[in-house]
Amino acid sequence: MHYRIGTRGSKLALVQSEYVKRRMEEAYPEDTFELVIIKTTGDKVTDKPLAAIGTKGFFVKEIEEALLSGSIDMAVHSMKDMPAECAAGLTFAKAWKREDCRDVLILKTAGSFSELPSGAVIGTGSLRRACQLAMLRPDIQFTAIRGNVDTRINKLMDDSYGLDGIVLAAAGLNRLGRSSEITEYLDPEVVIPAPAQGVLAIETAEVNTELLDKINALSDDNSDREAVAERTFLRLTGGGCHAPVGAHCVTKDNGDLRMVVLFGNDDCSRILRIEVTGTDSEAVGHEAARMLGLE
């Protein structure tokens, strides 16, 4: 059987899709796989912060349309960029082994976040990241920055942008082989990551059960349970487009789930954080939302 894998054309998207292609080829040598590059609205609109655009779907709309039309068979995304609800007729496969979920800092000269001088400027397009870092250092300024990893690092090094540092996801830098450029890893209990950060989203049509079964056979149980808990919470918050939403779930030694979550308003004047534990992924997500008064 021949399968077409849809992907964005950025360097990171291609690295992730090549990884999925390689694993599928190794597991199913009787099948063939090819990458199909699709340009999305998010690739074209690069001058606005994510919160101002108002939807995560702008990274995936054209790819999901290709899935629904049958011009591709599966698609690979970063799960943290996906809308809280899957498009009608589509579904996500179970999560494969998760990459590092942490946020990281790349600083121009300072050796750590605590060493940044008062008034330093940090670039991030994420309200979640800016809100949490501002709570730790209210004397630091934040400015919106968009673009792929190369673009953001180039802006940091270009003095005309006036940046002292940028915030990125460890997973992307690791996948690109650029982890040596990280200045500091941020504790996920302090700066809570985006829901399902570090997880690859592999999406198919619901009716394509044979392909879905093949993808699911390569899944990682702990990563999948954690991702389901985090994304259940994300869905119950309304999707995380206009408000800071974070979730970090880990599997304890006894198999129970422990999740810390964050939810705030759009100006970061009210930030709530709570911790929940449980055994069922969806129930943990629902309990977190209930404790915050979201359901």
Curated annotation (Swiss-Prot):
Assigned EC number: 2.5.1.61
Q: How is the cofactor bound?
A: Binds 1 dipyrromethane group covalently.
Residues bearing S-(dipyrrolylmethanemethyl)cysteine? 241
Which Pfam families does its entry note? Porphobil_deam (PF01379), Porphobil_deamC (PF03900)
| Record-linked Gene3D superfamilies | Periplasmic binding protein-like II, Porphobilinogen deaminase, C-terminal domain
The reactions it catalyses are: 4 porphobilinogen + H2O = hydroxymethylbilane + 4 NH4(+)
Q: In which pathway does it act?
A: Porphyrin-containing compound metabolism; protoporphyrin-IX biosynthesis; coproporphyrinogen-III from 5-aminolevulinate: step 2/4
Q: Which GO terms describe its biological process?
A: protoporphyrinogen IX biosynthetic process
Q: Which GO terms describe its cellular component?
A: cytoplasm
InterPro entries linked to this entry: HemC, Porphobilin_deaminase_N, Porphobilinogen_deaminase_C, Porphobilinogen_deaminase_C_sf
Q: What class of enzyme is it?
A: transferase
Q: Name one GO molecular function term.
A: hydroxymethylbilane synthase activity
Origin, by domain of life?
Answer: Bacteria
Task: Name the cofactor(s) required for activity, per the record.
Answer: dipyrromethane
Q: Which SUPFAM superfamilies match?
A: Periplasmic binding protein-like II, Porphobilinogen deaminase (hydroxymethylbilane synthase), C-terminal domain
Q: Which residues form the signal peptide?
A: none
Q: Which UniProt keywords apply?
A: Porphyrin biosynthesis, Transferase
Q: Which family does it belong to?
A: Belongs to the HMBS family.
**Cited NCBIfam families:** hemC
As a miscellaneous remark, the entry gives: The porphobilinogen subunits are added to the dipyrromethane group.
Q: What does the subunit section of this Swiss-Prot or TrEMBL entry state?
A: Monomer.
- Please explain the role this protein plays, according to its UniProt record: Tetrapolymerization of the monopyrrole PBG into the hydroxymethylbilane pre-uroporphyrinogen in several discrete steps.
Give the protein's recorded name.
Porphobilinogen deaminase
